């Protein structure tokens, strides 16, 4: 019992030390390094990542005028990332809260997402995007996972509300994504993993 108490005290002290270290992290420098690394990796994949600057915010950093171009083009006025220390320790994997303002995705025609965000948990076998939300012409609510080795959707349960002008595009996307239509302008991205197996 005495050994358990000592171990618990040590864990509390360690958690306090990490929290203090986290509070004084030079987030602007961390963000600048992370974005430079991301831009380099995107370039090797045939994509271009540009931004105008990085600022520190409480618990993370914010990137201004972000554009990611390739097969499609994603742009937003600002992208804010706040890594979660305690959540990462609990999940034994990196966890980060992501939010953006005035986001849009161009894929044939622009999709205006407005403001939104999600929480991402990145494990070696699965990247989870939960709490997906947007408030623009294209509204998304739900979650999905990506299998890094296959770069395919593993599990998903997300509602998508789209304007009438984009319905034809959704029908096309239906050939590549697990989309189900449930009324005018209302779609669901759904995929469940078979028990003990891999999602199809």
Question: What does each model-found stretch correspond to?
Answer:
Residues 1-4:
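N-terminal Lys/Arg-rich, disordered targeting/topogenic segments
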Residues 51-56, 68, 76-91, 115-126, ...:
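Extended lipid/amphipathic-ligand handling interfaces
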């Amino acid at each position: 019992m005495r050994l358990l108490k000592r171990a618990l005290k040590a864990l509390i002290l360690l958690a306090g030390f990490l929290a203090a270290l986290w509070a004084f992290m030079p987030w602007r420098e961390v963000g600048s390094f992370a974005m430079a690394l991301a831009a380099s990796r995107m370039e090797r994949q045939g994509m271009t990542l540009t931004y105008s600057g990085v600022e520190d915010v409480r618990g993370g950093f914010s990137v201004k005028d972000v554009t990611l171009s390739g097969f499609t083009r994603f742009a937003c006025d600002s992208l804010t990332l706040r890594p979660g220390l305690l959540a990462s320790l609990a999940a034994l994997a990196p966890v980060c809260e992501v939010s953006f303002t005035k986001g849009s995705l161009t894929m044939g025609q622009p999709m205006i997402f407005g403001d939104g965000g999600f929480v991402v948990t990145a494990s070696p076998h699965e990247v989870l995007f939960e709490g997906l939300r947007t408030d623009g012409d294209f509204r998304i609510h739900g979650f999905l996972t990506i299998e890094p080795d296959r770069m395919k959707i593993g599990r998903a349960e997300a509602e998508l509300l789209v304007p009438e002008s984009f319905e034809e595009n959704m029908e096309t996307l239906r050939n590549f994504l697990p989309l189900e239509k449930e009324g005018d302008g209302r779609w669901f991205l759904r995929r469940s993993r078979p028990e003990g197996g891999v999602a199809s």
